[in-house]
């Protein structure tokens, strides 16, 4: 029986979209299953208060782009929709510093910097990475704080995947023919710098995956099936993978479908991929899965805090610019970025409360809830105004704090009283996953003082549950199943026709925004696949790792003379954060 697809990909984010394009170019019949809906530019929410288009909560009739997932040790922000996290991410595309490549989990396998750099460079071109050209009010404030604290020389503008205009110009609102792919891609419109990147770009400036990898894959024959939630999968006796799905949000039997494929790629985002692997293991569908599943789950050692004024300052436009416009490095292992939402997008302000400190040498033994009450009692009216989400985006500088330290949590499933298995977490390998980052709080308090505002954290921090937008790992690369879930070619140990190609395969904390790394790892993984019908040069599982040369696709979509053409060259230093 002929399968529905040669390759079926679950998820359409950075890993899934890269894989879809490159394997379509190699002649495979590719299908992509996406739980979320498809958006045209004008269909994105005008503000984050349009919850049906912004928030992901299918049981409530909300099919937006913003997922929020709670875990015991962390609260997670993620993406949804055709294009995955590219729809609501902050456009920021850094190459990580050296500790990522040298992490003890995988550094002994190969020279990862040497192997991955050509693929980082290719992903940069595909995603249209340029240096942010605008120095905003938030950048000025952050730069002044960095200067005063002695690390002003670390301030840099961010590398972003945004179209500002042709040939390095800024032409806001002007539409031009495809500037990246020699006519194979869509027309693009110059960025308005309205700050609405994370609610969905309505202007055609953000280089989402729909504008590049995924859109090109579809034009070459890949089939994207939206509003399709995967309920389970298993390998049949004939070797094919059978994937059971239901129409997202439906409870009806008639909305169930089954797909078959020779090869199956999990790219459902770290949360989604981990959930599927745990579920299939617990139900006996993947009995040979490595016991390392869930180990080395990372949060990017992250904290999301911020500073807010009590009323809008007419002399400060904190919504101007793309979502993230600059970076500072207060310590060798800490990276802070100012973040913004556009005017009117204030719903995420409901996550904010007053800043509190955790325990430890630089902290306090006072419980965080008590700190909150003490601070609030000093200025009750000011606290109420600070917590009011009205005009929150116009009053707030969000501070995204990341580190490339070796800490992690371990995710696992446990059976509850009703026999239902629950997904949970605990502290993992290395140093404890931070519940707060002291230098992040210090910098944020300085920012608050600069704007005559109040420093804030998130409600989860009162219970030592930080917020992260970068949930990673848990199905990491190892040199055998005792040390990893997947091999260095991204094949799941024990199941060589099952792959993990998304954030779950990130094997160490990055200390920078992860999207470029996910794309680069996916580029490398797909480059090692043979063209359809040719001999697979990857060694069988169980044999020692061999470094292989990338295999050019037989049917490239992008013309060879276009900026985004597939070619492996040294990396552009603009986005090297090392």
UniProtKB/Swiss-Prot annotation:
One of its GO terms (cellular component) is extracellular region. Its main location: secreted. Keywords: Cholesterol metabolism, FAD, Flavoprotein, Isomerase, Lipid metabolism, Oxidoreductase, Secreted, Steroid metabolism, Sterol metabolism, Virulence. FAD binds at residues 15, 34, 85, 90, 230, 503. Coiled coil: none annotated. Pfam families: GMC_oxred_C, GMC_oxred_N, NAD_binding_8. It catalyses: cholesterol + O2 = cholest-5-en-3-one + H2O2; cholest-5-en-3-one = cholest-4-en-3-one. SUPFAM superfamilies: FAD/NAD(P)-binding domain. Disruption phenotype: Mutants lacking choD, hsdD or both genes are able to grow in minimal media supplemented with cholesterol as a sole source of carbon and energy. Mutant lacking this gene is attenuated in peritoneal macrophages, lungs and spleens of mice. The deletion mutant shows less efficient intracellular replication in human macrophages. In contrast to wild-type strain, the mutant induces nitric oxide (NO) production in macrophages. It exhibits a significantly weakened ability to suppress reactive oxygen species (ROS) production by macrophages. Gene3D superfamilies: FAD/NAD(P)-binding domain. It comes from the Bacteria. Residues 529-551 are annotated as: Disordered. The active site is at 470 (proton acceptor). Residues 533-546 have a biased composition (Basic and acidic residues). Its cofactor is FAD. Belongs to the GMC oxidoreductase family. Bifunctional enzyme that catalyzes the oxidation and isomerization of cholesterol to cholestenone (cholest-4-en-3-one), an initial step in the cholesterol degradation process. Contributes to virulence. ChoD does not appear to play an essential role in cholesterol degradation in M.tuberculosis, and is probably important for pathogenesis not as a cholesterol-degrading enzyme, but rather as a virulence factor. Required for interference with the host Toll-like receptor 2 (TLR2)-mediated signaling pathway and subsequent intracellular growth and survival of the pathogen in human macrophages. Can successfully induce the immune response both in vitro and in vivo. This is Cholesterol oxidase. It comes from Mycobacterium tuberculosis (strain ATCC 25618 / H37Rv). The gene is choD.
């Amino acid at each position: 029986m002929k399968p529905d697809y040669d390759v079926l990909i679950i998820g359409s984010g950075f890993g899934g979209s890269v894989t879809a394009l490159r394997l379509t170019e190699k002649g495979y019949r590719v299908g992509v299953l996406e739980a979320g809906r498809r958006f045209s530019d004008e269909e994105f929410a005008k503000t984050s208060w349009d919850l049906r288009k912004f928030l992901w909560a299918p049981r409530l009739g909300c099919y937006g782009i913003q997922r929020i997932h709670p875990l015991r040790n962390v609260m997670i922000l993620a993406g949804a929709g055709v294009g995955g996290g590219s729809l609501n991410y902050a456009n920021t595309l850094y190459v990580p510093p050296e500790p990522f490549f040298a992490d003890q989990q995988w550094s002994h396998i190969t020279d990862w910097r040497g192997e991955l750099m050509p693929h980082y460079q290719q992903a940069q071109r595909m995603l249209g990475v340029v240096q942010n050209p605008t120095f905003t009010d938030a950048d000025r404030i952050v730069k002044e704080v960095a200067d005063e604290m002695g690390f002003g020389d670390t301030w840099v503008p961010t590398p972003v995947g945004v179209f500002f205009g042709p040939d390095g110009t800024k032409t806001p609102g002007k539409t031009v023919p495809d500037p990246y792919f020699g006519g194979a891609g869509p027309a693009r419109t110059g960025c308005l710098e309205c700050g609405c990147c994370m609610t969905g770009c309505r202007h055609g400036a953000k280089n989402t995956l729909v504008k590049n990898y995924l859109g090109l894959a579809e034009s070459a024959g890949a089939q994207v099936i939206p509003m399709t939630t995967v309920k389970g999968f298993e390998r049949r006796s004939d070797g094919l993978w059978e994937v059971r799905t239901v129409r997202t949000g439906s409870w009806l039997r008639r909305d169930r479908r089954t797909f078959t494929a020779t090869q199956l790629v999990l790219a459902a985002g770290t949360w989604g991929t981990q959930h599927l692997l745990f579920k299939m293991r617990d139900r006996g569908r993947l009995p040979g899965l490595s016991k390392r599943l869930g180990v080395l789950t990372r949060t990017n050692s992250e904290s999301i805090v911020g500073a807010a004024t009590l009323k809008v300052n007419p002399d400060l436009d904190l919504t101007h610019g793309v979502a993230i416009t600059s970076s500072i490095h207060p310590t060798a292992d800490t990276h802070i970025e100012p973040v913004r939402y556009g005017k009117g997008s204030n719903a995420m302000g409901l996550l904010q409360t007053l800043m509190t400190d955790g325990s430890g040498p630089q902290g306090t033994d006072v419980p965080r809830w008590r700190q909150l009450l003490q601070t609030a009692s000093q200025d009750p009216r000011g606290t109420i105004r600070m917590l009011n989400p009205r005009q929150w985006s116009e009053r707030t500088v969000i501070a995204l704090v990341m580190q490339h330290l070796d800490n992690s949590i371990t995710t696992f499933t446990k059976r509850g009283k009703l026999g239902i298995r629950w997904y949970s977490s605990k502290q993992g390998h290395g140093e404890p996953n931070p519940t707060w980052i002291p230098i992040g709080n210090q910098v944020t308090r300085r920012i608050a003082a600069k704007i005559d505002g109040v420093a804030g954290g998130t409600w989860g921090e009162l219970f030592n549950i930080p917020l992260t937008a970068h949930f990673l790992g848990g199905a990491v690369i190892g040199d055998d199943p005792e040390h990893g879930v997947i091999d260095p070619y991204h094949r799941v140990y024990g199941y060589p026709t099952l792959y993990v190609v998304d954030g779950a395969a990130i094997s160490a904390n990055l200390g920078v925004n992860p999207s470029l790394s996910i794309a680069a790892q996916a580029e490398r993984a797909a480059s090692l696949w043979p063209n359809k019908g040719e001999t697979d040069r990857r060694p069988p599982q169980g044999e020692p790792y061999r470094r292989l040369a990338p295999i050019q696709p037989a049917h490239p979509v992008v013309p060879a003379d276009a900026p985004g053409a597939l070619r492996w060259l040294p990396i552009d230093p603009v986005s090297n954060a090392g």
